């Protein structure tokens, strides 16, 4: 249905843009054998009337625009009128998130053509038949009626208390309820933690290969992700010498992913101790992504790096997406620990 107000606005705008007068339309109409009077045009200009479709199509053709757009039914086609274009932020120029990039597009194309594709780009247990435990679903259903309002910004007290108890089991030091933040998955909290910390040009040491969200969040926060090597020939462990070489006076933090995504490496205490020593020497924050900490095989034990660094400020991330097979529930958390006295302003920023 034609929108009279939009038609009038666009009609008058086009007259100005094309530097045309009403008499020019009358002349064009006469040349095309279209019956159009001066009083009709005056009504279109004033908004007292909207032309019949055949007249509107003639006017649109004369102006070189789409008739539907002129009637207010859709936007102008590219090239017909100078419309403002909206482009992505330049902050995205150096952001890559390949777990949902061209490779996935190609996989989707293959699926559409009948190829069976196993998608391992994201840690999503559901498509492979791993189901959420019945107890979790039952408790979620039972609690829904009590969750209609907002919680505190850090999350439900009962949930944070349970996470605090888990932190104690992991020997993470100096943790209280107020040091625990729950979020819409760990991804949201990674973004929050980087945005609250970084100024333009600040550097963060990030493993390579890494889970690409870390590099993306550092970049979007105005920082620079400096990648240190995790070498396949050395069990995918971080190259400590490479880490040391890449520390500068702009380095604020180091990220570790343990157990590692995507390599699956589980770092032993000896490696973690060396990373702690580098962080201690250069006064860095340690961000430890431990979302896979309960998916450890072959009798190995996961050690939280925060348990080895009580004198440093550490931020530990984990959640239930992988361990409890509820990725779609979006349950993640972040734990602040260690020497919090040196991070009071940062913690205020998080809040």
Which residue stretches match the model-derived regions?
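A short, Lys/Arg-rich alpha-helix, primarily the initiator
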Residues: 1-28
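Short, charged recognition helix plus adjacent turn
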Residues: 19, 71-83
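Short alpha-helical DNA-recognition segment
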Residues: 19-43
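Short, basic-rich loop-to-helix N-cap that marks the start of a DNA-contacting helix
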Residues: 46-61
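N-terminal small-domain helix-loop-helix segment of the aminotransferase-like
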Residues: 84, 93-185, 192
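Conserved PLP-anchoring active-site segment centered on the Schiff-base-forming lysine
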Residues: 196-218
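Active-site phosphate-binding strand-loop segment of PLP-dependent enzymes
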Residues: 232-300
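Conserved core segment of the aminotransferase class I/II
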Residues: 307-351
């Amino acid at each position: 249905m034609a929108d009279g107000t939009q038609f009038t606005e666009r009609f008058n705008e086009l007259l100005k843009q094309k530097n045309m007068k009403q008499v020019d339309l009358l002349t064009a109409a006469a040349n095309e054998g279209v019956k159009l009077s001066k009083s009709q045009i005056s009504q279109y200009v004033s908004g007292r009337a909207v032309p019949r479709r055949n007249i509107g199509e003639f006017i649109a053709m004369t102006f070189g625009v789409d008739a539907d757009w002129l009637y207010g039914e859709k936007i102008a086609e590219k090239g017909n009128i100078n419309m403002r274009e909206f482009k992505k932020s330049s902050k995205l120029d150096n952001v890559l998130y390949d777990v949902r990039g061209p490779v996935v597009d190609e996989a989707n194309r293959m699926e559409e053509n009948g190829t069976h594709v196993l998608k391992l780009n994201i840690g999503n247990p559901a498509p492979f038949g791993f189901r959420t435990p019945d107890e979790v679903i039952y408790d979620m259903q039972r609690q829904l009626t009590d969750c209609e309002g907002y919680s505190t910004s850090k999350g439900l007290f009962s949930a944070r208390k349970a996470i605090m108890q888990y932190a104690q089991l992991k020997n993470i030091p100096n943790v209280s309820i107020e040091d625990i933040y729950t979020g819409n998955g760990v991804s949201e909290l990674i973004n929050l933690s980087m945005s609250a910390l970084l100024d333009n040009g600040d550097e963060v040491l990030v493993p390579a290969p890494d889970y690409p969200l870390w590099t993306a969040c550092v970049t979007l926060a105005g920082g620079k992700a400096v990648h240190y090597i995790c070498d396949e020939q050395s069990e995918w462990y971080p190259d400590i010498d490479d880490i040391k070489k890449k520390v500068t006076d702009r380095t604020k933090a180091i990220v570790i992913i343990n157990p590692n995504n995507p390599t699956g490496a589980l770092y032993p205490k000896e490696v973690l101790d060396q990373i702690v020593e580098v962080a201690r020497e250069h006064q860095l924050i340690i961000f430890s992504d431990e979302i896979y900490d309960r998916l450890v095989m072959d009798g190995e034990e996961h050690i939280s790096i925060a348990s080895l660094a009580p004198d440093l400020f550490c931020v530990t991330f984990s959640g239930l997406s992988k361990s409890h097979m509820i990725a779609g529930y979006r349950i993640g958390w972040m734990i602040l620990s260690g020497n919090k006295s040196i991070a009071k302003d940062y913690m205020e920023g998080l809040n």
